[in-house]
Amino acid sequence: MHIKTLTVSQLNRYVKNTLDADFILNNASVKGEISNLKIHSSGHIYFSLKDGGSKINCVMFKSYAYNLKFAPENGMDVVALGNVSVYEKEGSYQLYVKDMKREGIGDLYVAFEKLKEKLKEEGLFDDVHKKEIPKFSKKVGVITSPTGAALKDIINVTKRRNKGIELLIYPALVQGTDASRTLIEGIKILNKVEDVDIIILARGGGSIEELWAFNNEELAYAVYNSKKPIITGVGHETDFTIVDFVSDRRAPTPSAAAEIAVFDREVLINEILNYKYNIKNYMENIIKEKRNYLNLYKQKIEANSPTNIIVNEYKNIDNLKELLNMKIEGKLNKEKNNLSRLSSLLEAHNPLNVLKKGYTLIEDEGNNLITEKEALKELNKINIIFKDGRAKLSIEYIEEF
């Protein structure tokens, strides 16, 4: 019989092909305990599954790990679904996990979803039933474990935000078979305390089994029927319980629940001071505006008063009088200038001025001016006019040139 010699790579490839062709190994469902867990920065998860007798290496790639409903931890019992194949480089086989569920949790998830759907159909989750969260609570009821971290967180937040707020704490179990009963009792008792303004139902984080008391149907009805508003702060931000859907406000953590229930005193003081400042400015602006209107109306009244009208008329008369005087003075000056001009013109044409140069004027006895010698032929006597007098002369002869 001839035996074919294979290289290591050929052998690993052959084993891989053989495993990949196996129907059972391609659809394997393996139950075991997680160990050697490593969550890589790439998002891939590497771990081993073990039981009392052996273990198998496993890998869950990022695309599948993204859809996990829980955070895997060492020591956790799970059921992994995937295919068995060979990692050729190392010559080792491992389970390539595509999905993973916590062992024994499946029934709890089914019960959770069933109750959630039932209460939703009954309208317990409807916003119309949500009670208003008071903005300024004076006393806050807290239902939680007296020894848990949740209570410490709530107390710390309350002291930081408002030391004047009173916390009324009802010590309750927050996990175990009797937890739901004590939580319901706490709601009933705090509803009877008249000055409790709001109730916080809280506990710290935990597994689904540890939080299961908050998925109780009777507790859900107790929260729904509470006369006082209830804020739930159960687990961490990713944890959701039935009471979170029923409550009037769901907070991601107990600390966040306290932030909602307890108003910040410093913030309130600052808001009041800000309102005071705004009101002061508003009133000052109104007063300023009204004062301006008052001054305007005052000016109008003063302007239209009889005294001011008379004073203004006197001013108008004085102005008209001054204007009239200016007009008259201007007219007189103009006439004086015209008179002076005409006087100068008349003076320039005064015949007596010619006489001052040694000339004389000749008139007949009727004082008619004689300008030609022919007129003398009919006259015996003439008047001679000098610059400073006149003389009467007789004509002896007339000589022609």
UniProtKB/Swiss-Prot annotation:
CDD domains: ExoVII_LU_OBF. Its main location: cytoplasm. Pfam families: Exonuc_VII_L, tRNA_anti_2. GO terms for biological process: DNA catabolic process. It comes from the Bacteria. InterPro entries: Exonuc_VII_L, Exonuc_VII_lsu_C, OB-fold_nuc-bd_dom. Its EC number is 3.1.11.6. Keywords: Cytoplasm, Exonuclease, Hydrolase, Nuclease. GO terms for cellular component: cytoplasm; exodeoxyribonuclease VII complex. Coiled coil: none annotated. It is found in: Cytoplasm. The keyword Cytoplasm applies. GO terms for molecular function: exodeoxyribonuclease VII activity; nucleic acid binding. It catalyses: Exonucleolytic cleavage in either 5'- to 3'- or 3'- to 5'-direction to yield nucleoside 5'-phosphates. Belongs to the XseA family. Heterooligomer composed of large and small subunits. Bidirectionally degrades single-stranded DNA into large acid-insoluble oligonucleotides, which are then degraded further into small acid-soluble oligonucleotides. NCBIfam families: xseA (TIGR00237). This is Exodeoxyribonuclease 7 large subunit. It comes from Clostridium botulinum (strain Hall / ATCC 3502 / NCTC 13319 / Type A). The gene is xseA.
